Amino acid sequence: MNENKPDNSQSLACVFCRKNDDCPNKYGEKKTYEKWNFSVHYYCLLMSSGIWQRGKEEEGVYGFLIEDIRKEVQRASKLKCTVCKKNGASIGCVVPTCKRSYHLPCGLQKECIFQFTDNFASFCWKHRPVQAITSNKYSSSLPCTICLEFVEPIPTYNILQSPCCKNAWFHRDCLQVQAINAGVFFFRCTLCNNTDIFQKEMLRMGIHIPEKDASWELEENAYQELLQSHDRCDIRRCHCKKGRDYNEPNSKWEVKRCQSCGSSGTHLACSSLQSWEQNWECLDCRRITYTSDFQKAPKHPLANSTNVTVTDCLLEESSSKLPRQSTVAQHKELLRQGSKFRRDISTILIELGFQIKKKTKTLYINKANVWRSALEQFQSQKFNPSCSIDVVYVNGNEVGSQHLGSKQEFLSHLMHHLENSSVFEGSLAKNLSLNSQAVKENLYYEVGKMLAISLVHGGPSPGFFSETLFNCLAYGPENTLPTLDDVSDIDVAQIIIKIDSATDLNILNSVISQHYNYLEVSGCLRLTTSLSDKFMLVKDILFYHVINRVKAPFESFKQGLKTLGVLEKIQTYPEAFYKILCHKPENLSAKNLSDLFTIHSVADVQTLRFWNSYLKAIEDGKSATTMEDILIFATGCSSVPPTGFKPSLSVECLHVDFPVADKYRNHLVLPATNTYEEFQENMDFTIRDTLRLEKEERSHILPRTLNVSSNEEMLI
């Protein structure tokens, strides 16, 4: 008959600590012995100060004789715990001058150290061993190398540092769980695999390393699943009607596995992948890759990132096969990525730019209709967003009238059109509009794709998103609260204002009756029994008008933003993208603009002095020209793109009467004049006249007016 009866383990408390808890990681294995009518935690027995292992392993309890256990329990019953003030404190601090005694759980609560080696010494919270505190060279938190949750890199009771790797930090609980699973033969530093130094330090700091084989070595067919390939779509929203397990090679329903872990997969169609894309990584692997690269080289974050590959994809869930972070932990980490890493937006976009291939695609753009030209080129089946882009400007139907153009200038013109197009509404901070013609032509998807391509290929930042639109993209519509500022329709805004300003229930019901049809069709009609109901009614109308009403355009817009993995980066680093999607770049100062230009060849000292004086005069408002005008004249862009100018800006002084700009090379030639007045006059005249002519050249663009549904107007 087996003396250990697990079924009774809950009825008998441990004879030492008087707790029923069965927690092997904290107290060791709990065993109940029916023959002697007691239960005991392994660690409580092992750490008791007045008992020694006098029997063989198979005798008594773990080699401790039963009579010795009873004597130790009797001895402990006379000792009061320093923590809980109850009797039974069988463990005492090993320091001779210290008189503290405690139960094992109380000692753990007070952060005592129990050494599972040699004489199994116990140290109270005053005399416990500590790790040396070195100078903290880390400006922010670092991840625990086991669970990847962030810790402050300062050694404490709960945070331990590896003795052999300065960058390896651990939670105490994570180390203990790993030690129990790995055993003495496989427990080692997670970074350098050192065993001797690492185990010695961990034993000193109270980590129990059992003398057993690793748990995975004892499991039958532990590695059997490694022989199987993963053929399941793990994307959050699988669009395959035949289910996640359906896999049809050489079709859009072929399952592509993560190139790094192989334990997550996606249908090509579910992640908007094309057949020409060979690589795909799941969200877990991409997050680890970028975290590792950023931690290793904060000054040069791109130096070791050549293997990074990002593709269009939905936000995936972790594969159920991998024991990684919990869903809650992943969600928290996702929301705090920006604040933890403080990643610069240029670094993120440059990483996305690693996908761009050397193979080029030439876009033929009519300056008089940039929008329609770009739309035709991007909708072409041969267009590949991961190819490098060359731009050639054509002049209508004039044969032979074409010249090489600046890609960044083209993208700048395209962003200007998108900002003022019919797919957005609002004055400065814009939301998506409801445009039936745009839905029919799939323009919301195309606009999203254009924005993504512009950001990755070095174009300017949009800067016109409303905070509500951005929050919908980054955190989801369900976590977004629209405001009255998001309502650009005057009639709807008046309804909301009337309801919100109602001072009694009769006035509120009168307003509801007046706009009954609109409230009913929009799904916002509700029974109002008190004046306070108006707040929920206003909230419902705002959510319907700003979010639910444009649900289909929003989903299409999101699909477009998934191009080149941009949407996923927005959701991973919302803080970084908020600055470029919702805010225009700050105005350039004279010094900032001057610093953008590199002096080319030998410069004329006087001309450079005139140039700096000219910039200063513009900054002081003494010229009709602006800093933005100079930037447009030299590059075609009204602001500095998030990834900077490629090629970098250069300035040259030549013996010419008027300034000359080469936007393809971002090169500016300054005129050589005898006086500053002549220099300023020539610069002002040329820049303003050139910009005026270019504006006239682009004046014949696609009309903006695409009306909303007449049914909605009738309802309002």
UniProtKB/Swiss-Prot annotation:
It catalyses: S-ubiquitinyl-[E2 ubiquitin-conjugating enzyme]-L-cysteine + [acceptor protein]-L-lysine = [E2 ubiquitin-conjugating enzyme]-L-cysteine + N(6)-ubiquitinyl-[acceptor protein]-L-lysine. Residues 369-696 form the HECT domain. In the developing embryo, expressed predominantly in the central nervous system and early limb bud. In the adult, highest expression in Purkinje cell bodies and cells lining the ductus deferens. SMART domains: HECTc (SM00119), PHD (SM00249). GO terms for molecular function: ubiquitin protein ligase activity; zinc ion binding. It comes from the Eukaryota. PANTHER family: G2_M PHASE-SPECIFIC E3 UBIQUITIN-PROTEIN LIGASE, PHD FINGER PROTEIN. This is G2/M phase-specific E3 ubiquitin-protein ligase. It comes from Mus musculus (Mouse). The gene is G2e3.
